[in-house]
Amino acid sequence: MLNNKRLFTSESVTEGHPDKIADQVSDAILDAILKDDPNARVACETTVTTGMALIAGEISTTTYVDIPKVVRETIKEIGYTRAKYGYDYETMAILTAIDEQSPDIAQGVDKALEYRDKDSEEEIEATGAGDQGLMFGYATNETETYMPLAIYLSHQLAKRLSDVRKDGTLNYLRPDGKVQVTVEYDENDNPVRIDTIVVSTQHADDVTLEQIQEDIKAHVIYPTVPENLINEQTKFYINPTGRFVIGGPQGDAGLTGRKIIVDTYGGYARHGGGCFSGKDPTKVDRSAAYAARYVAKNIVAAGLADQCEVQLAYAIGVAEPVSIAIDTFGTGKVSEGQLVEAVRKHFDLRPAGIIKMLDLKQPIYKQTAAYGHFGRTDVLFPWEKLDKVEELKDAVKY
């Protein structure tokens, strides 16, 4: 008999993972700048390795930020507070290599191509995209957060892993960790059970593997994953190498923008390739990806599709997107052409329009840099609002 069930896997990492340290540092610097200079241009990259961090990039701003102080505060908050962890906020070296934004790029952002020969003082019209590129947003009704179940549970487990370390429940845990969840779908594409959960967590040298496995199940997995999704066939792999003492930047170098699938939809939807962290909202890699999620989520919440993927694309120095594409994977209640028409009418997808629509000049980015930019339950980001649902319903009758 043919088995029509399928498996899909996504992963997340904790805030102490080297790549996520880099993301959080880059976004902490961005926030510190935006707090005093909302119009700053920031492209901040971070590299972390044993005993040091390198901060590089292009920043144009009217304010001053003590970058080493921001870096140390961020590392401390994550939990690298002792030299024995292989990374310590007090003793680490911090190198900075910061230039200003290229004037060639700035002229295209400051004055969009469409309005370069006109006397438009309207910022929404005047601002061009900070780069070319394509961005995707996605939503599905398989969870209350409009996220695929595998990435949603991966983030929840990774956050729980960090929480039990920080609150002392499992005080032998260390900051680095990874989680992976495999979901089984039935023939109608509904999630029915968890097939496999993988948890790898850094730990103190003096704790046994058996204790770690028992504690992770009791304090991380069972309180987080709904009981009806786990059965006797569910497989658990907890620290399957047997030992994870050396971790964080001592174990692996980390770099901003290396966890773009963790940051988005866990591989369930397409990705344009651009990362988010360390970029101010004139960079459409970030702001347009947020806008695409905003559009997709409101379409699904309006009942116009069970799942929806939105692609936006831009040319550097040009305000209007060069293309808008929508794919509902056969679940749409109306044609994709009708949806595109409604989106053009009710969403301003020019860079400055996105910034205004989603209020993106706020210093809100550090909290996006771990446990996902989308579908969060611990904080409500502007691109997660469902305030366009009624407008979309009215615009598209079926």
Swiss-Prot record:
It comes from the Bacteria. One of its GO terms (cellular component) is cytoplasm. One of its GO terms (biological process) is S-adenosylmethionine biosynthetic process. Coiled coil: none annotated. ATP binds at H17, D176, G177, K178, R243, F244, D252, R258, K259, K279. It is found in: Cytoplasm. Residues 101-111 are annotated as: Flexible loop. Its cofactor is Mg(2+); K(+). It is an enzyme of class 2 (transferase). Keywords: ATP-binding, Cytoplasm, Magnesium, Metal-binding, Nucleotide-binding, One-carbon metabolism, Potassium, Transferase. It catalyses: L-methionine + ATP + H2O = S-adenosyl-L-methionine + phosphate + diphosphate. L-methionine binds at E58, Q101, D252, K283. Belongs to the AdoMet synthase family. This is S-adenosylmethionine synthase.
